[in-house]
Amino acid sequence: MRYCSTRAGVQGRSFRDVLFSGYAADGGMFMPENLPSLSAETLRSWRRLSYRQLLCEVCELFIPEQEIPREQLEGLVSSALSSFSVPDAVRLVQLKDSLSILELFHGETLAFKDLAMSCTAHFLQYFLRRDRQRATILVGTSGDTGSSAIRSVLGLREVDIVVVFPRGRITKIQELQMTTSVAENVHVFAADGTSDDIDVPLRKLFADADLVQRHRLMSLNSVNWSRIMVQTAHFLFAYLQLTPSLPEGDTLPVLEVLVPTGGAGNITAGIIVKRMGVPLRLVAMVNANDIVHRTVQSGDFSMSSSVTQTLAPAIDIQDPYNMERVFWLLSGGDGLMVKSLMEEFQKTHKLSLPASLHQQLSEVLSSGSVSDDGILEAMRRCWQDNHYLICPHTAVAVWRHYQSPVRPGESRCCIATASPHKFQQAVQRAGLTLELPESLQVLDQLETRCADLKCSDDWEETLRRHIESISSRRNS
């Protein structure tokens, strides 16, 4: 398995190469040069696997044996998921009205990102220790990514992590999960802007090849292929758990998956699984920040003038950068076309998809947009019907379930991306109550540490100097 850039300028890279990369040198994102195919026979053979076992099978498709041997791979996955609070790391809950919810939030920071982040961090540690090297991780977050990334590398001597979050645009718990991480290898910045504003200097820093090489700078955002790879496993797990049977022959039942969508990494993983041969009907669900919905419906891939703050802050995103991977997949790997499209979008923040590409997109993906009122409505109804509380992001998917009956002969799954415990304001707005677990209650009592990125500051230069100071400290 080799990897290439979505913009055609880089080919033939190893898994290790892309693991330690942010964006490719040409500004693109890494993808497998060829996707493996999953036959009906293979899916049947995986039917009784646990999530952990299935994840190993998936990773083996994309990580050659000579890079991480199977025995070591199994050990890394097992160790990565050892701190999750349920036995198999994920849990499927089946409720009234054919509502099935795949809970992906049982990691230490109570968000689905813990699954891919913990595995990716263990893969990093494997190579860094083997090669006796160090790395600096640079991460921008809209809420959940930052704390998950910090937790995955907390205290590792081989890694420093720099995390930037948008001040005032995430929940208090999300902020405290980052700022109370005062380990020597953790560096947290609060920026006076949106998560999309944060992405701009980060992309520029990753485009500086000399900076990346000198400081071994890398990303744990979903620009990192490893995150997408791991996320493909929960789509496969949902399919194998919820399809009633896999009859002999090549005709397989369909599973509809409703996916809360922000940066589009999760929905990209779903599309990859679909392209590998699994019959998924994918629905990207967004909040008022509806660029993905508009793109699917009309081909209008254009940013709004500002990011709207909603009750689902982790998907308050107007620049869903993983859509570049989707465009590359659907164009048949036409990197030159993707390069042209994305350079236009990055320059003007507006793009009208070519008709053929929009048609391809609308054939593989449906979409919907939900207001804050709809989020609260879904939270209330799910509680009233089931005494089951969902977070506002999960509610974006569950709202669609309540509005649209399941098609005859099909099954459906809603992806639960975070625990409701992290979103007390939304829970209270819905007229519901939820007692915080002790791990969150104590956050207010802990020491915090955070640096500022003010509107008047040069964010790129400030972060560049900090990255250089980290390397200087290491080498002293």
UniProtKB/Swiss-Prot annotation:
<protein>
    <recommendedName>
        <fullName>Threonine synthase-like 2</fullName>
        <ecNumber>4.2.3.-</ecNumber>
    </recommendedName>
</protein>
<dbReference type="InterPro" id="IPR036052">
    <property type="entry name" value="TrpB-like_PALP_sf"/>
</dbReference>
<comment type="function">
    <text>Acts as a catabolic phospho-lyase on both gamma- and beta-phosphorylated substrates. Degrades O-phospho-threonine (PThr) to alpha-ketobutyrate, ammonia and phosphate.</text>
</comment>
<dbReference type="InterPro" id="IPR029144">
    <property type="entry name" value="Thr_synth_N"/>
</dbReference>
<keyword id="KW-0456">Lyase</keyword>
<dbReference type="GO" id="GO:0046360">
    <property type="term" value="P:2-oxobutyrate biosynthetic process"/>
</dbReference>
<dbReference type="Pfam" id="PF14821">
    <property type="entry name" value="Thr_synth_N"/>
</dbReference>
<dbReference type="GO" id="GO:0009071">
    <property type="term" value="P:serine family amino acid catabolic process"/>
</dbReference>
<keyword id="KW-0663">Pyridoxal phosphate</keyword>
<dbReference type="InterPro" id="IPR004450">
    <property type="entry name" value="Thr_synthase-like"/>
</dbReference>
<dbReference type="InterPro" id="IPR037158">
    <property type="entry name" value="Thr_synth_N_sf"/>
</dbReference>
<dbReference type="InterPro" id="IPR051166">
    <property type="entry name" value="Threonine_Synthase"/>
</dbReference>
<dbReference type="GO" id="GO:0030170">
    <property type="term" value="F:pyridoxal phosphate binding"/>
</dbReference>
<feature type="modified residue" description="N6-(pyridoxal phosphate)lysine">
    <location>
        <position position="113"/>
    </location>
</feature>
<dbReference type="GO" id="GO:0007420">
    <property type="term" value="P:brain development"/>
</dbReference>
<dbReference type="GO" id="GO:0016829">
    <property type="term" value="F:lyase activity"/>
</dbReference>
<dbReference type="GO" id="GO:0008345">
    <property type="term" value="P:larval locomotory behavior"/>
</dbReference>
<comment type="similarity">
    <text>Belongs to the threonine synthase family.</text>
</comment>
